[in-house]
């Protein structure tokens, strides 16, 4: 049995092109995962990804996860709702292109359909522009 998988891409060249979410929920906070913790990325990737057929990292060893999130070009942000982890996004800065990729973004199943997705996406886009300004020139060029 084969399943058709579609990938969609969004390109935003300026924050003025962004239609922001209407509100940040009162009990929600998005913050950088610092220090980086591969277990958090692995948890979200597997938990959210099983619903969306994310498979490329399922074969990764802990060493591969650690190498990935240790790369200075990779930043992980966590959405917390009432202090519980609800979702995440990963940003990857591509120095040579002067652009930032939202590598993965998602909400845990129990937080879906609660008006959090637009808030998470808006934050990911805003932070992707910040990443362009603050990523170190000394960042390692390898990803994955």
What residues fall within each predicted segment?
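An amphipathic alpha-helix signature
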Residues: 38-42, 62, 66, 118
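A conserved beta-strand-loop-helix scaffold within acyl/acetyltransferase catalytic domains
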Residues: 60, 80-81, 86-97, 104
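Conserved acetyl-CoA-binding loop-helix of GNAT-fold acetyltransferases
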Residues: 107, 113-126
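Non-catalytic positions within long, well-ordered alpha-helices that form the structural scaffold/packing
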Residues: 129-130
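Short amphipathic alpha-helix that is part of the acyltransferase structural core
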Residues: 22-57
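Single conserved hydrophobic/aromatic residue that forms the stacking wall/gate
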Residues: 134-144
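A short helix-loop-beta-strand connector motif used in the catalytic cores of GNAT acetyltransferases and
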Residues: 52, 66-78
């Amino acid at each position: 049995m084969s399943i058709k998988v579609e990938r969609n891409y969004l390109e935003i060249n300026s924050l003025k092109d962004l239609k922001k979410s209407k509100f940040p929920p009162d009990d929600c906070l998005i913050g950088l995962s610092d220090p980086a913790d591969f277990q958090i990325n692995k948890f979200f990737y597997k938990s959210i990804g099983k619903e969306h057929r994310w498979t490329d990292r399922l074969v990764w060893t802990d060493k591969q996860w650690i190498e990935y999130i240790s790369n200075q070009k990779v930043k992980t942000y966590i959405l917390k709702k009432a202090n519980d982890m609800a979702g995440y996004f990963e940003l990857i800065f591509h120095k040579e292109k002067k652009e930032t990729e939202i590598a993965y973004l998602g909400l845990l199943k129990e937080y879906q359909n609660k008006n959090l997705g637009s808030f998470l996406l808006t934050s990911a886009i805003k932070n992707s522009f910040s990443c362009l300004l603050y990523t170190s020139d000394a960042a390692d060029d390898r990803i994955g």
